[in-house]
Regions:
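Membrane-proximal basic amphipathic "stem/tether" segments
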Residues: 1-56
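Hydrophobic, aliphatic-enriched repeat segments that assemble into extended interaction scaffolds
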Residues: 2, 65, 69-72, 190-197
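Preference for short coil/turn "hinge" residues that link or interrupt alpha-helices
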Residues: 2, 9-12, 75, 96, ...
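Intrinsic-disorder/low-complexity regions
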Residues: 4, 77-79, 248
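Generic detection of long, well-ordered alpha-helical segments
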Residues: 6, 18, 22-25, 61, ...
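Short secondary-structure junctions and interdomain/linker hinges
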Residues: 19, 23, 35, 39-42, ...
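Extended, charge-enriched "interface" segments that sit outside catalytic cores
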Residues: 33-127, 134-138
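Aromatic-lined, polymer-binding surfaces characteristic
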Residues: 113-117, 126, 132-249
């Protein structure tokens, strides 16, 4: 957040005074990082990361034959709700959400704050019209997409597999790196990375199931492209803006 967008300068001043000398230095460095990232970003297409699946890498997918009936029933129930446009957040709040959501919308308050403005210029702590960024972040953690991918793998559901992949593509198209409210928290970016690992592994394992026909090449190519869109930008962001010092995270 740049100085012009600070909601209460006195709060930041008092917090700055309570920081250690080393944390103050790092906060200043982070401030200038934000200025730099406002002007220019790396070309994430020029990454040097190895992104193809490796044997023994995280996550390790258990055998679908070992899944208990209780899990199958729960996955079927959750998948049906998600496909019908109902998503549960914070374990108890049910939201009606489009199949391809507005990723910067608080669906509980009905407030859409979609923007392509640089995240360095956004104050996520104070949204207009009673909106809460936590409702935006929760949907963009992709937890419901992990659930779809789990159901696809355990119950051999081709449609859930494809929808999970399509929704990640949709998120990427509407949340370009360092633009909008979903790029204001490195912690949220880290949670997305973890969930993406599961989505990738589960959908790839689903495609390899002979009962669905040979879809390994088609899905493998789609995921290969998706990794290039998701991983470099998120890894860079999470590391560059990692929590330190007195941060609650």
């Amino acid at each position: 957040i740049l100085l012009g967008d600070m909601p209460d300068f006195r709060w930041y001043r008092d917090r700055f005074r309570a920081m250690s000398k080393e944390e103050r230095k790092e906060r200043v460095r982070q401030f200038f990082r934000r200025w730099k990232d406002w002007w220019t970003l790396p070309d994430f297409r020029l990454h040097s990361m190895s992104m193809e699946p490796r044997e023994g890498a995280f996550p390790e997918i258990p055998s679908r034959e070992d899944a208990p009936e209780e899990l199958k029933s729960a996955l079927r129930f959750d998948s049906d709700r998600i496909l019908a446009g109902s998503t549960t957040v914070f374990k108890q709040i049910s939201l009606k959400v489009e199949r391809h959501p507005d990723w910067q919308k608080d669906y509980l308050a009905g407030v859409n704050v979609e923007t392509i403005k640089s995240s360095t210029h956004l104050n996520h702590r104070k949204l207009p019209n009673g909106g809460d960024v936590k409702l935006i972040w929760e949907l963009s953690r992709w937890g419901h997409l992990v659930r779809l991918a789990q159901e696809a793998y355990i119950l051999n559901d081709r449609w859930s597999m494809k929808l999970a992949i399509r929704q990640v593509y949709h998120w990427v198209r509407h949340n370009s790196p360092m633009n909008g409210y979903n790029w204001t928290s490195a912690l949220e970016g880290g949670l997305r990375l973890i969930n993406y690992c599961w989505i990738d592994a589960l959908t790839l394992a689903t495609a390899a199931n002979k009962r669905l026909g040979d879809m390994s090449e088609e899905v493998g190519n789609s995921l290969s492209k998706l990794r290039k869109l998701v991983l470099p930008a998120h890894v860079w962001f999470v590391w560059r803006y990692k929590s330190f010092g007195s941060s609650a995270n």
